[in-house]
């Protein structure tokens, strides 16, 4: 069978690919070279799904029982190296709320703060992952004279553009919105610093904080026992953040790292194609020890069929027929090479109901809003009953 995909009125994408995949060929290469010594390696992947498929391919290739190598995600790699525990997101939200209230002297309720607090946690995470100087980033810009001078240079069109996002923006005068913005911005670094300090004292951290903690120690040549006597193989990465680059670079210097990049598609090797942005940099800086055999089946042979269907309900019903036609019933692992991609999360439940009955194992890798679940509907009905009784 060739590679192929069906596109149903631009809503659903069903892809099927052959078994001779990138991960399969890497598993085969390492088995050929090491066989009984595979457990000496730690294979690191961008996500858990890739690691699970790599482990599956290893089990198919091996002819005899052997000790499995360690297969982890990049987040798990940082976590195990740090000896810290990953803090619970809800606990982090309460912690940063209390810190914010203490530093800002605010009486803001948790309900009001929660939405902004989640964004703050996400920003702190990105700051650390990208190894940004937080003190410089969260610069105190409370000197209103400088702000007013900055705002006054805007043209009328620029002011109108800003007002689309900040409706109270008025460069000619001070207002409560601007004062609140300045007051909030001025305390972000103290909040960030105190938040990390409290987490560290409890042996906790969030992903970005843990990654930065590990890479800081590596750059300072401090010993991290977990890395000792390990050989790491990084597989399938693309857009590396600064923490990941530091980790790979430092392990490479110690001859403890090997790298494999999935850049076989012609588009990824075309310098004029934006998709090739990371190709040259990654393959030049992080080279592979073994040459991986190219995919036997060219991606140029991919068959694409467009199916025009006017409604979402009709699309889900068509998927039932497509999946039924792809594989015979009771064929073991027949759907492991098939992906159904939906851009609209509201169609997830109708899609699940449309899956043929003989498919009893499905891996759903997208989120689904609680408000659309049957439980949420039940709770809404109970609330309505209580209010109207």
Per-range role (PLM):
Residues 5-386:
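Nucleic acid-machinery interaction/catalytic patches
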């Amino acid at each position: 069978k060739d590679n192929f995909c069906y596109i149903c009125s631009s809503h659903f994408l069903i892809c099927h690919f052959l078994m001779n995949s990138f991960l399969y060929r890497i598993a085969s290469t390492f088995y050929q070279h090491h066989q009984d010594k595979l457990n000496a390696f730690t294979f690191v992947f961008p996500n858990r799904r890739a690691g699970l498929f790599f482990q599956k391919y290893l089990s198919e290739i091996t002819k005899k029982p052997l000790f499995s190598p360690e297969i982890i995600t990049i987040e798990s790699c940082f976590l195990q190296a740090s000896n810290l525990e990953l803090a619970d997101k809800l606990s982090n939200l309460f912690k940063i709320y209390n810190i914010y209230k203490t530093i800002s002297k605010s009486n803001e309720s948790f309900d009001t703060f929660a939405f902004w607090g989640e964004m703050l946690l996400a920003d702190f995470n990105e700051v650390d992952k990208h190894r940004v100087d937080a003190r410089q980033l969260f610069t105190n810009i409370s000197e209103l004279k400088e702000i007013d001078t900055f705002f006054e240079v805007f043209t009328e069109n620029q002011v109108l553009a800003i007002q689309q996002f900040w409706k109270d923006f008025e460069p000619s005068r001070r207002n409560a919105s601007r004062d609140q913005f300045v007051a909030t911005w001025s305390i972000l670094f103290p909040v960030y610093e105190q938040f990390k300090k409290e987490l560290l004292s409890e042996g906790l951290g969030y992903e970005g904080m843990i990654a930065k903690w590990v890479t800081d120690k590596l750059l300072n040549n401090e010993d991290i026992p977990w890395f000792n006597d390990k050989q790491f193989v990084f597989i399938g990465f693309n857009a590396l953040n600064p923490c990941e680059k530091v980790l790979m670079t430092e392990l490479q210097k110690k001859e403890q790292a090997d790298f494999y990049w999935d850049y076989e598609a012609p588009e990824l090797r075309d310098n004029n194609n934006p998709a090739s942005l990371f190709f040259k940099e990654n393959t030049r800086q992080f080279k592979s020890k073994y040459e991986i055999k190219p995919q036997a089946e060219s991606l140029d042979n991919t068959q694409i069929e467009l199916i025009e269907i006017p409604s979402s309900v009709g699309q889900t019903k068509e998927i039932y027929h497509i999946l039924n036609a792809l594989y015979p019933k009771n064929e073991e692992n027949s759907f492991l090479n098939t992906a159904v991609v939906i851009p609209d999360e509201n169609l997830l439940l109708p899609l699940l109901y449309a899956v043929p009955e003989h498919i009893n194992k499905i891996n759903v890798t997208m989120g689904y809003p609680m408000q659309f679940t049957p439980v949420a509907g039940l709770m809404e009905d109970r609330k309505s009953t209580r209010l109207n009784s």
